Amino acid sequence: MQTSLVRAEESRDLSASREQLWSFLAEPYHLSDWWPGIASVQPDRRGLAPGARWSLVGGGEPTLFRKAHATNMLIVREVQPLERVSFHLLAQRLDVEIMLRALDADRTRVTVAVAGRWRPEALGRPRALPRHALARLHALVQTAASL
C-alpha cells in the first residue's frame, strides 16, 4: 500500500502572552484538553523533557480500524522553553511541532505542524489535525482571557 510523506501546518494568533501559553502547554495533563482524539495523559516522571514518554488514551467512538479508548505513546523529542516543543505519536506515526512567537505582550502566534506518512485516502484527517488543535487551544485560551 503506497503512502505519502505529508506535512500540514496551521498558525493562529491567540490573546495570551507567550509565557501563559507555554505554562499551559508545558503541563502534560492539559494535552487532552486541546489535542484531538486524546482523552487522558499519563506522563512519565520527567514531564515535558526530551526523551520523556507519555501514555495516552484516545477518546471517541470505535471505528472499523480503531477501538474506542485505544492507547498510544507520545515521545517528547525537543523542548525549547517559551519557543517550541516537538513530539512523536507512535500509533499514528506522526511528528508534531508546536511553535510560539510573541506578537506583543498579550498576543502570541501559535503554529502547529504535523508530518507523517499516510495513505492517500487518509490524507484529509491528518491534514486537519493542526487546525482542530488550534481551534480547541483558542477556545481554552480565549475563555481564560475573558475571566
Predicted regions and their residues:
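Hydrophobic ligand-binding cavity/cleft-lining segments
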Residues: 1-49
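Hydrophobic-ligand-binding modules of eukaryotic lipid transfer/binding families
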Residues: 1-13, 103, 107, 131, ...
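Short, surface-exposed charged micro-motifs
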Residues: 11, 75, 97-99
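Hydrophobic beta-strand positions in extracellular immunoglobulin-like domains
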Residues: 14, 60, 114-116
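A short, structured loop/turn motif at beta-sheet edges
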Residues: 18-19, 46-49, 77-82, 99-109
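Hydrophobic pocket/interface hotspot
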Residues: 20-25, 31, 56, 76, ...
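Glycine-rich portal/gate segments that line the openings of hydrophobic small-molecule binding cavities
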Residues: 42-95, 132, 140-147
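Beta-strand/loop substructures that line and gate deep hydrophobic ligand-binding cavities in soluble
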Residues: 84-143
